């Protein structure tokens, strides 16, 4: 490709809230530009995992190269970067945006602007993108394009007078979107003669090709046979294959400035290719590195254990394979007295946790139990040491701790007016601090600071049920704050169960402990001796329930006769039960763990 045609390249991404029709629009663009023959088209072309299609969400960012002849008679190359919409995958969004110059903002004309639309738009604005608003689903009877245009102008502050009204489902007005991309989005800039400088956008593992690296060329040219250097990881590799995606891989000779494509080489591990790294030619290196991405930090941790201990090795292998494709997922070995061997895993959020667990169960046929999700706490010890606590069971002696800090989030909630009271009460109950409350048309936009610990359990489910599914929620971790947090242990028959221990705020410890004990009382089967179920903070018991003993009638075989005979048998039974209570083991069934962790308040 010559320098002349860098003006005919457009790199763009599509940002939208879940279900506003982003993947469907991508399908239509692919179809309209004739990139894929009609007989090969399928729904959600760019969502390659089954789980993405089933849940209707995009998890991994994908790219596709479209070739389009515009009304001005010129041929354009459009590189579409499909991005996920969900907050857990915000880092996938940020790296797709960094490789583009513009974005299409897709808003559902019947739903209007949602919380995650906002979050992603702000990311696009941070990346200095030109943004073209697109109103989707205008063919629905409930569509109100004019109201939504006003909303876009009010909430986001974008000029929506030239928003393109489309229906991605029926294919209405898709040509207008392509024209808007060509006319309104800027062309990339780059110098073909300069040393190679490229941004590593993504990498994944392919069984046949090894590690495949997705790059956006800024300056210079990437050719076959070249030796390249990753500047951040400081490693050099040979380039075997270069190509682009027309959803399927297609080989080409070279990638020039402004282009997006992939290469494969002698790279063994995905971990060697850090997203956001700068790639340059080994012989002729560029002097300055690109501003990379932030390292992704795991926010939520939980233990994953195989139901059958024999599956431990398969679980280890499965995790290694998933780690190849998802560098944001981290894990380390841990053992639990109650659950045996397993792993402590770190995730970006709750959806990420669910998806990893579902992929492990589905793609590798494993049966898993997960322990209660927890967040990372910071402990300042009396001797001045700073510790990070990932697992509540490892909490050191409270006497040695000076302060405990927990992560807080800044949450933006958009909800219809009539559910506002319930939403505010929910946030208040979760120790929230109200920051802001605005009205956008008939909807309230509430901004709250909340402790992440309170959100991790079931905040999202509760929010959806309070608002009948209409409220949308988006958050980012803002900072760490000191809190009066205590470790609550659950004791069954005076034995602590490590998998059920958690850190809670002192004010909520009692209600949480009581609820947990009541739940376990119903779930643990009765034994021949009485079992106390207790919640404790340190040595102090804060809640207790008792599982009654099954009683065996030992005097059944005595007909009448002397009372002392019966008493002797009853005393003998009492003796036995006492001994049993001392040495008897209480089996806690699997369901009890799972149900106890899904606890409602």
Curated annotation (Swiss-Prot):
Membrane topology note: Peripheral membrane protein
Binding site for GTP: 19-24, 136-139
EC number(s) given by UniProt: 3.6.5.n1
Keywords, alphabetical: Cell inner membrane, Cell membrane, GTP-binding, Hydrolase, Membrane, Nucleotide-binding, Protein biosynthesis
UniProt GO MF annotations: GTP binding; GTPase activity; guanosine tetraphosphate binding; ribosome binding; translation elongation factor activity
Catalytic activity, reaction form: GTP + H2O = GDP + phosphate + H(+)
tr-type G domain: residues covered: 7-189
Reported function: Required for accurate and efficient protein synthesis under certain stress conditions. May act as a fidelity factor of the translation reaction, by catalyzing a one-codon backward translocation of tRNAs on improperly translocated ribosomes. Back-translocation proceeds from a post-translocation (POST) complex to a pre-translocation (PRE) complex, thus giving elongation factor G a second chance to translocate the tRNAs correctly. Binds to ribosomes in a GTP-dependent manner.
Family per similarity comment: Belongs to the TRAFAC class translation factor GTPase superfamily. Classic translation factor GTPase family. LepA subfamily.
Name of protein: Elongation factor 4
